[in-house]
């Protein structure tokens, strides 16, 4: 069986790791970096760029360069968070036929799992290049506060990328695994994982216990905000720059997508610089132009200014920390360690706020960019059976229930229940002779069902006529280890039952996923063909260069007919290389023709080199003979070793 890789599918950056024995290895991508930007660009020639190459061209192709797509995964178009992003993103966010939020590139509608699958495919390829073998299984991380739809959509993305997702694991839990197995502290410990990433925020309270030599990681509680992260911090800087530029120049940059893309890049860079310095300068020449000519942007931003701009965002992370502590049934003073995860936690103001709340310095010895992928790889090793000393007990982040009479949300499974878990409850009909019941499944903490997230609904039909309250309908909720819900309803009188895996009344259908898997496979084959074509072109170019060079040096040693034959074959190869529509077979045929025509030239070069070597060897032999003739008076056997003394002068 191949290795199960661990993937941190992040909003801003992604990372892949594997276990080698008991050592973890974070794998560098083809650009040599340990993290890959979660950016996907769709080019005019149908090529798809992922990671750094996509980021590099984003300024010139803003409408078809997709980033932060994780914020949309498993979300409905109408959700207020999605509506907020529509006005901020340079690319189009559209409403799919099923009501989900999708994106658009080159006029093609794309589901967020389909786009995220491109990043996962890059991670898969990165691991395969390192291991030298195919990879088909993965553990993928999600924010702890992701709901059922978002988890299902992430699983779908894995399938589209050609991966069997062995487990969906919560990011803070993964970071705790990485921390707990890396550090040598003994005894039971309670840790808080504060995870502020590119698009989401999570906090989990986790107890690490040593039970008979087995490390047990039990999540006591989790809380968070799936629409708060580094992207929002960047946006505050962008809004500030736009406001200042409008005051100075009277030009509104918010409607200019090219300018916005440059501003995004500059804002991210400024934010990072201000983590280590007190002031930075944003300098963007030719940001726009009007009738008076080109406009340049030059603005100094101090750390204090940045902190003022994002103060409320940092503050927003503290309430979930309070709730998590309360739900875990512990006091702040019970927390032994605070772990920071996610790139945004490098901001000094965030670290200061965390220290202020928890009353202790957060640990600095955990890599915030890599810990989550490392934890996923450890969980992969546990699932493959190669590691027996780790037990992970995670929780469901939000309460699950059904809508009952009067639109009330009746909770079946409370938040922070350890998973996997199962719960059954008996309900009855609301009307006399009611022949069917509709069961609506919700997730959330509000008292009324309408205030929560509708995950899906289904009918149980064929209930025998009876007065209201008489039929007994048993509803079963079953949450698997991925945090994904399966619901069943059974009429106890007739034994009739109906079961569903909650796929939401949105989400991708099985047929859509299958089609996307096939498209992805077709793209992989197409990519392979393109790479082979590029290799043939490179080979052709190199052959043209080397043959021309050889002709210049040795052409005069060839007969006229031979030289003409080579030149004609070279001309044909150059023509085929200049033609953009030439395929691999055409190029290979002309390469072969040049190689065949150049055989005589190769023979002449070889003969010439041999002659040169023979000449050099003859000259060296003659020189050696001359030397022995001069020293011939003393036969070698009679050489006398001279003794010498060092004479010191006073």
From Swiss-Prot:
Compositionally biased spans, kind Low complexity: 611-636
Keywords noted in UniProt: ATP-binding, Chaperone, Nucleotide-binding, Phosphoprotein, Stress response
Induction, as annotated: By stress conditions e.g. heat shock.
Modified residues (Phosphothreonine): 200
Any Pfam family hit: HSP70
SUPFAM superfamilies per UniProt: Actin-like ATPase domain, Heat shock protein 70kD (HSP70), C-terminal subdomain, Heat shock protein 70kD (HSP70), peptide-binding domain
Start and end residues of each stretch annotated as Disordered: 611-650
GO molecular function: ATP binding; ATP-dependent protein folding chaperone; unfolded protein binding
Record function comment: Acts as a chaperone.
Recorded family membership: Belongs to the heat shock protein 70 family.
The protein, known as: Chaperone protein DnaK
Organism: Burkholderia pseudomallei (strain K96243)
Gene (name only): dnaK
